[in-house]
């Protein structure tokens, strides 16, 4: 299209790391007499495309860690409560992340302790796919993430140690369950990342 339209100069921020592309487009532009400038605002372009670049170079999802802790470095109060240990502004930032990212992942203990919805509460926000890491399928059948109107956006990652009857009940509800080989009696997070990236 660029060649057919008679464009004489093309400015490229950063090269596409996709090995299937491998600079062929740039070569074709140059062969057709088009001036090509590469690397303009390269760092900003790479930052803007970091999610794609991570996936295309590693076949892994781009992961952002969001955590909260009390002033003494704990993730829960003395009573074991972890809900609302952050302020309103921090919670809003968390919901902005949920809106921007494709998925949110928690361990089953978070589901058992807090029964969170893991939805985006920003007006007109987009709900992420909810991923629960649960090696032995201990998720309560009354958990919000497997019962609410967004249950079709829930993935449970488990192992062959999962209770087969519970597995069937969850699948019958339309819950997406990934069964992975266990590593040290837990979900192998390395394999989980590979599986999630392939979706």
Language-model region placement:
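Short Asp/Glu-rich motifs
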Residues: 21-22, 48-49, 189
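Short, flexible helix/strand-to-coil boundary loops that buttress conserved ligand/catalytic motifs
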Residues: 14, 49, 79
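Charge-rich, low-complexity amphipathic helices
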Residues: 24-25, 32, 50-52, 58, ...
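Hydrophobic, well-ordered secondary-structure segments
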Residues: 26, 42-49, 91-98
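Active-site ligand-binding patch in enzyme domains
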Residues: 54, 64-71, 75-199
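Proteins enriched for Cys/Gly/acidic motifs involved in redox and nucleic-acid/cofactor modification
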Residues: 40-68
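Zn2+-dependent cytidine deaminase-like catalytic core
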Residues: 1-45, 129, 155, 160
